[in-house]
Structures are given as structure tokens and as C-alpha cells.
Amino acid sequence: MLFRSARARKQVGPDGMVMFDAHCALPPPFLIQLAGAIQAYDVTYIEEPAVPGNIEVFKRIKQHVKIPLAVGEQARTIWDIIPYLQERIAEFVQIDLAHTGGISQMLKMATLGEVHQAALAPHSVTSDLGMSANLQVSASVPLFLIQEYYPSITPKDLIRKSWDVDKDGYASLPTTPGLGCEINEARLEEISRTPSKPEWPTRGRLKDGSISDY
């Protein structure tokens, strides 16, 4: 992880942002030790430092880690993030629109973050349709930092979108009615009739056979 952090900093230069995703996978003592080691690479935040639910574990991590913490990827409602904001644990909220109650719930959670000076940095591993909704929310939130984006996992020719992401990572906003996407219903019907193996990110297993949610 030290090597990857150093390489990431070198690739993006002094003005780029480097984030570290702990993916709830590290015991607190290891995370605390690692955070101290990668701090030299000016890490913007540590994402998912622990499994959500035990606020005392997050308090312990926050007490020892100087890098800002980002939480909220697995949050479903405002009640899931309130404790982390009230206890001043989270500097960033990573709400995932696909996990919450849609645009309305995400806006409420982003507003709560703003009240506590926690910037929005949405988590998003989704289709073009989901990304369109994310962009609509992100564009309307004053305290917005960055939008996670992966090249589309949407089946080819299924969705025509009215936005794009350029080579520098900047996204244009949807320009057509609604979410800014048009669904090819004939293609959707075709796909629904064709059995297929689930692709990333729903594989569920790593190369060594171990189980993973990614």
C-alpha cells in the first residue's frame, strides 16, 4: 500500500488528489498504523475505514488518524450517517444513490453533511442511468468535492446519455429531460431474454477463490 500510495502521488503530481479505500477490510490497529505511514503522500481521505455500525470503533480510529475520514457508502437513510456527523468523525460523506432512497434521500444526506461541514464525494459503481442521477445531485450540492466514476458497465446500446466525461475527468451535466438518458426498450427486452454470467462488480469472488463483495 505504501508503494501504491507513492506511485499514485507521483502520477497525479502535487495538485492531484490521492484517496485510500480501506474497504472495511483492515483491523483498527493495522489501519491506524497504515494511515500514519501514508500520511506523507498527502492523502485526501481514507474511505470506509471500518465496518459501519460500531461508532466506538470509528471514534478510536479518528482519535489516532490525522487523515480525514470518508463514510456513508453503505448508508441507506439519514439515520445511518447522523452519528458520524454529530461525533465529528466524517469529513466527507460518500453517499451512494443506488443504496439510498434515490435522489430525495441523497439530497437530505448531503444537506446534513453540509450542516456539519462534511463535503459530498458520492460513491458510484453503477450504470449510465445511475451516474446520470448522481450528476444531477452532485451539481446541486454547494459543498461538493468529487464524483466517483467508472467507465460504463451498462450493456452496449442500452442507454443513450446526454453527458460525457472528458480525458481530464471532468463531467458535463445531462441536458435532456428527466435524468438525461434515453433507454432503448427493444435492447432492454433483448437483454432480459438472454441469460448471462454476472460481470464485475457482482462477481463475488477474487482470483484466489476468496469471497468478496467486489
Predicted regions and their residues:
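Metal-dependent enolase-superfamily TIM-barrel catalytic cores that perform enediolate-based chemistry
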Residues: F3-V65
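Short, intrinsically disordered low-complexity segments
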Residues: M1-F3, A8, S192, T202
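Shared catalytic-loop signature of beta/alpha-barrel
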Residues: G36, D42, V51-G178, E182
